[in-house]
Amino acid sequence: MAELNDTYVVHTAMIRCSMGMRETYLVLDDTHGVFLRQQPQMTVDDSVGEVNVRCFGGCYSMENPSTKSEADRIQKAVEEECPDTFLDSVLNLFTGGEKEITTQEAQEGVPRIVGVCTPNIPAGTKWDNGKEGVETRGMEPLLGGAKLRCIYGGEIEIITSGQVEGTGE
């Protein structure tokens, strides 16, 4: 099979977001009239969040208001449920309440916080890998390996073309 970056992308190609919980599919809600192996071909303009780019199951980005809200909710619950221990109280007497936590201590045993994933792609943003010199209804056909950025900081990447392998018949 050809290298992904040189392969045309069709409806149901797999995509991944660097801030998402899982992979999902790239979808085409209305065909452009061009098909590859009976599957609608995608273009660089097929980059609309929640239309072409579907939910990745959850979002880890703290730039996402949903994730930030969940983090704030958890922090408040922890502060209410876990007042200072006796040791913390004694240490506070000697340190004035200042306790430095190392990065490793802060990361150990802390689960990642997840919010609602709503892919938010700025209007007019296009995928970054199209087939130049070829047009599908005036738009460049989309090629594999293309990337797109969500406003919440996630990098969305096409990881399969979506094309079904031929049987050779």
Task: Describe the predicted segments one by one.
Residues M1-E169:
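Intrinsically disordered, low-complexity proline/glycine-rich segments
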